[in-house]
């Protein structure tokens, strides 16, 4: 008889010691990577800036503040301008993810992804462009390059003074400077600070899956900023737990949003990555979400493979690509990783009270 395989510490708890879903005994399908995080994809780094100040009644411009910024570098902070092939999917378009016209046209984006609150999305985009310019050499600056950065948002106004515009340029830069590989924090951190999910405290969550194909092992990692769902909809590992945890009062129709980012080191072309982004939406469904009328459910998938081909500006390029018959196993890995990332965003959380005493239970 063989003994049970010990669960790695990073699968059980976040770096700050917050419980993750696996640590609480929730069973999931699939084999995660070393950290069960999007950072299992080599080169990917994630950083946060979390802003929590004040309590009591809302005073616009003063607080309470419950917000922040998340930064995600596809090829690490050491290569801030690096491009990646990508695909985009909007399951429900009541939200914003900038730079997607370029992704739809050319199948790529450049530089870091930022995720924040709805009214700080434009600021994050502009600061990213300025920061990228400042990190160029003098010769490159003379060419006056341009960027169309990826910045995404969900609404945190239930807990946060969203119209106070408390995220500043220095906060976006702080998230860049915090970017790292390895295990990353989850829950009420970064852009996820003031978010709610299934009427619990939501926010930042991540997970990964390993995929064996053609004698190689690839990784698919997911990162979400969860801010969607009604309590009764919640499913965990297929069990309808939300119906057993009713609210005292009906909160009305489903609002909120989710931003999902899927990274892989598998060599995929943009059209394949768009198909991956579509499958990420199934991860919401696995948790019980339905993409309500006022929900913005937006997904971006990118590959870290083929850096030379992605960044080539002329000539004939050669790229290594997966055969189409491989895609189904990556679809499955994506769905399971997104599902677990959402549930992790719930588990790795604590009760938060924000503006006007509104409380999101952890």
Show which residues each predicted segment covers:
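Alpha/propeptide regions of enzymes that mature by internal proteolysis
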Residues: 2-362
